[in-house]
Amino acid sequence: MSNEREILAIGALIHDIGKLVRRAELVDKNQKHTLAGSVFIADVDVDGKKIFAPYQKFVFKHHELDLDDSDPLTWYVCYADNIASSERQTTQDEGFEEKRTLENVLARIGKDEEGKINSYFKPVAAGEIDYATDKNTADRSDFRKLYDALVNDAKKLSLNVENLRFLLYKYLSFVPQSTQKQGIMDISLYDHLKVTAMIALSIYDYVETKGIKIEKYDDLKKLENEKVLLLVEGDVSGIQRFITNVSSKGALRSFRGRSVFIDLFQEIVVDRILQETGFFRTNVHFVGGGHFYLVISNTEQNIEKLKKIQKEINQWLLEKAKDLKLVIESEPMALSEVKDPSEVFQKINEKIRKAKLRMYSVDELNELFDLVNIRSVQNLQTCKICGKRTDKIFSLREDQEPLACDFCKQMYEYGRQVMHAKYFSQDPQGDFEILNERYSFVDEPLKTKNYVLGLRKIDPENSQNLVFIDIVNYAKYQEFEELAEESAGKKLACLQADVDSLGSIFREGLKTKTLSRISTLSRLLTYFFKHEVRKLAEGKNVAVVYSGGDDLFILGGWEDILQFCYEMQVEFRKFTGLNENVSYTASFVMFDEKENIGKVKEMANQAESLGKKCGKNCIVLSHGMKRVFKNHRSILEKSQIVSWKDFTEKTYKIYEKLSKLANSVDRSVIRKALEISLEDSPMNKAFLAYIEARENEQDRDFANLIRTQQIPALNAVLQLIDLKARRRDENG
């Protein structure tokens, strides 16, 4: 990778750093942000060396009027800055307002573009935001705190593109890009800087590869309507079958391990593409849930490299995990389309959809059949998990007979070792293999490439080869039996949730759909399903199987899962500015600790699908895994659908009140209430009135709550209360 590329990327990433300097009021208010950036360059002093000094030209000269002929690299940043800033909606002579906070783009989904919203994010570091507020200004001290932290960390870490990108993500994700008094301010400074670097690098590579002569700045402008960019989409198919294909022994570890593998696999695939095409993580638009988007240069060389990478990766998957298949497609994009790339996204989504219908080529099918035939005639053993023929099988646990091939054994170990690890590092002696490279989970980074698992403090002595990713790896316990031991009635539950109409949100939710704005929107959703979900899970009797992008799947004691359901919805509403146009549908399904995990996931899918069909923005409660069998499939027999509004305001509130009474109410009263919830007859109502006349105060209160309240999903609530009472009776 050429040194010029790294210089260009770093220059693009810091070109607007003066905007933070101005907001921290470290310069005179009349000083332009292009000059204010000199303060940052001077402050990041490492042993007398100002490490950003070689890049100051990008800070001082990224506006057309400031350009000269001495350094063509600044032209690329200037032009990319203009393209990335095409969403700015300003009026003439409106002036500046440095203290405005970042508007919540989630609160604007489906709303009048010109209308006022009342939802903003405080200017704090990533990881410190919990919800949006109605305060649209911040104090100078808020920005100064961010600035000081950024400068302090910049002095510690080795200066390279990925470290700088991460620092800007950490400290500028909730700082607005624009400093205008008027206009929409819902694009973060971080997203603007990243998209500027993305575009600048792509134009540079396009020009260099095609041998285009750029003798003056205006020559770059001539490329406006040319298909300079290439939108790349990747999709890992077969994930659901893959992650549920686990042994009943150690099922939770294997289930989580396979999910962790997908998280790491997608990141390693992205890095493989970036490495072979010569780009950085600045060119990653989105990655999560086995899906990714990149923006690189539209060259024949890159298109051929993508085909080669896809073929090589699928050959590896065919050997190791035949349930999985990687589909990669690309679509050219003009620089003028950055203002609204929605049509380009639609085209590439359709390409992916069609590609997934023809999962294997003739050559791949022949290779698969040859592999099966070779193994069938050899003296091999069969993996009892994936069915692969192999020369050796392993035990997952000491108390278990051998049953797993090397790959399935690794999936189990992923779930075990990820619990407390800080890094996933390339290691020739490592236990894990992905794409013919070996890796280890470690507490300290190695001298090779290290994937940093989440937001954490980095040792400056080991900051050379870091890639920052985020995996929600919380689990109180690693076995179903341990989770069940702390749960009433030893019953477990799962929560599955998925954002409603995500495609429509990106296609139609915003009138102005620039790349920077879409980037901010997708990053905020990912932020919630990573950082906020992690905070809500910590301390609870749960295990996060996966969470990120726009969905999650969590298992645990049913009481903790139910509490998590309530808290997550409350926090999601606050995070999205109470916008009814942004919602998710969830399923809450109870099961026994011995239940097959594949069946649990199937039930969760069916319950969630039911909620999607019945209006979305709801939770589907299913108690006890009651099933009928049809066409060899388990079908949910009884489910109760509750809107999130009813669940948070009524159902869960009544559940809390009844829970407090569960330890003292006669269980016969609870059982009678259960009958009433199924058949509201006059005789049953009379029985409740009789209970209210009893001397036992708790019985009276319980009966009164049931008789006088309109409770959505009452039967589901009462079954949960009956479980708590049953535990009380069993414990004496």
Listing of model-derived features with the role each one plays in the protein:
Residues 1-10, 20, 34-51, 187-219, ...:
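Alpha-helical phosphate/pyrophosphate-handling elements in metalloenzyme active cores
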Residues 1-124, 174-179, 224, 244-250, ...:
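Divalent metal-dependent catalytic cores for phosphoryl transfer on phosphate-bearing substrates
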Residues 55-62, 230, 282-295, 322-340, ...:
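A short glycine-enriched loop-to-beta-strand structural element that forms part of the catalytic core
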Residues 197-207, 260-279, 305-317, 484, ...:
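Alpha-helical scaffold within the catalytic cores of cyclic-nucleotide enzymes
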Residues 297, 308, 312, 588-592, ...:
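Cyclic nucleotide signaling catalytic output domains
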Residues 317-326, 350-365, 576-579, 602-627:
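Catalytic/regulatory signature loops of cyclic-dinucleotide turnover enzymes
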Residues 360-447:
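Cys/His-rich short segments
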Residues 614-732:
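Long, compositionally biased charged/polar accessory segments in the mid-to-C-terminal portions
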